[in-house]
């Protein structure tokens, strides 16, 4: 099993190196993702997997890298753009819930399952809620979340390069060097942040804990140094491999009638994101690519890493993505529970 995983990892790095030469953002993440998808599709082996713990280590490294981009101006930017952050969150959530209603009606599927499956950025929590709510179909939620996330992660890099004319700046996994404390000294602080975030039940703690801990250190200490190229490349590949392994052919077969609606819904969410990105870009003056990555219905790590590789404003991207995830994780579950309970009364 270990040798199989090592071979997959080497293949992911090789494919990622090829994507670097093609000047694509997040090349090693895409390399890991495509390697896993090819493996699952061509071999049809159910015993091939990527350990969750390896992916969590990778998220800590990515969290450090993302958090290291924060400066003392980040908080001021957030306050200045608070209205835009709220509007962006409401628009993407409203579009997601509306698409869930349409999908449930056309596919004749459970509405609660479709809503949980269509919410952007909340796969971890929605899968936990599935275990607590017997009315929710976990197969539907898993397939919808995985296909949406994979669709966004695969298409967004191509869209920002060929539609929005973004440029990859230098190495696609290299981080800007702000000087400051050496990364080896600060990484233990990131691990501590991950531990605390897990203990207080923060959403996606292995990512958000290191981000917040590193960001706080970076702001108050005047900056931290980036992790080495090879370490960030390995982290991206590990995250991509885990994502690709989540696609289960058996689950798709059981919910195959929904696949077209999921793909169309994902495309509509991307179009809505581009539209809202134009509004945010015109209002606040940051680039259209930054605004699009901030709006895109993908994961925090994936969109932030994509912005990092193109020299975009990662703090803006992270702020918008983080607020959306917090809203989804804190407010949406009780609101859904209240709404469905009132509907049944």
Sequence positions of predicted segments:
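Interfacial helix-loop-helix linkers and transmembrane-helix boundary segments
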Residues: 44-58, 70-87, 103-111, 201-204, ...
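Membrane-embedded alpha-helical segments of transport systems
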Residues: 92, 121-125, 142-161, 300, ...
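Alpha-helical transmembrane segments and their cytosolic membrane-interface
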Residues: 1-7, 138-185
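Structural signature of multi-pass alpha-helical membrane transport proteins
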Residues: 1-53, 64-73, 182-251, 271-278
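Structural signature of hydrophobic alpha-helical transmembrane segments
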Residues: 19-34, 54-58, 81-92, 113-118, ...
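Juxtamembrane and boundary regions of transmembrane helices in multi-pass small-molecule transporters
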Residues: 98-109, 152-170, 195, 200, ...
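Small-residue-rich segments of transmembrane alpha-helices in multi-pass membrane proteins
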Residues: 57-69, 91-92, 116-128, 149-155, ...
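Alpha-helical membrane segments and immediately flanking helix-loop junctions
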Residues: 106-147, 286-321
């Amino acid at each position: 099993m270990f040798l199989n995983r090592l071979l997959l990892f080497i293949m992911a790095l090789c494919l990622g190196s090829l994507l670097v030469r093609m000047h694509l953002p997040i090349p090693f993440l895409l390399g890991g993702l495509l390697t896993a998808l090819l493996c699952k599709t061509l071999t049809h082996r159910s015993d091939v997997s990527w350990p969750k713990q390896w992916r969590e280590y990778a998220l800590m490294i990515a969290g450090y890298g993302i958090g290291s981009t924060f400066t003392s101006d980040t908080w001021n930017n957030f306050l200045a753009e608070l209205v835009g952050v709220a509007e962006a969150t409401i628009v993407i959530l409203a579009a997601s819930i509306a698409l869930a209603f349409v999908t449930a009606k056309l596919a004749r599927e459970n509405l609660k399952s479709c809503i949980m499956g269509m919410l952007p950025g909340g796969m971890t929590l929605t899968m936990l809620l599935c275990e607590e709510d017997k009315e929710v179909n976990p197969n539907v939620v898993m397939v919808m979340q995985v296909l949406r996330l994979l669709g966004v992660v695969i298409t967004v890099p191509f869209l920002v390069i060929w539609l929005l004319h973004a440029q990859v700046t230098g190495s696609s996994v290299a981080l800007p060097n702000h000087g400051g404390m050496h990364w080896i000294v600060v990484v233990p602080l990131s691990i501590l942040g991950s531990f605390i975030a897990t203990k207080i039940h923060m959403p996606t703690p292995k990512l958000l804990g290191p981000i917040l801990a590193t960001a706080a250190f970076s702001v108050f200490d005047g900056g931290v140094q980036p992790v080495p190229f090879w370490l960030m490349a390995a982290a991206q590949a590990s995250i991509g491999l885990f994502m690709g392994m989540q696609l289960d052919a058996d689950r798709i077969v059981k919910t195959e009638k929904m696949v077209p609606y999921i793909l169309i819904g994902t495309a509509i969410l991307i179009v809505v994101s581009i539209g809202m990105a134009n509004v945010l870009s015109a209002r606040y003056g940051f680039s259209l690519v930054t605004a699009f990555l901030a709006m895109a219905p993908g994961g925090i790590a994936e969109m932030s890493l994509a912005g990092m590789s193109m020299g975009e404003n990662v703090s803006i991207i992270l702020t918008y993505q983080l607020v959306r995830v917090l809203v989804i994780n804190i407010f949406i579950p009780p609101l859904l529970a209240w709404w469905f309970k009132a509907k049944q009364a």
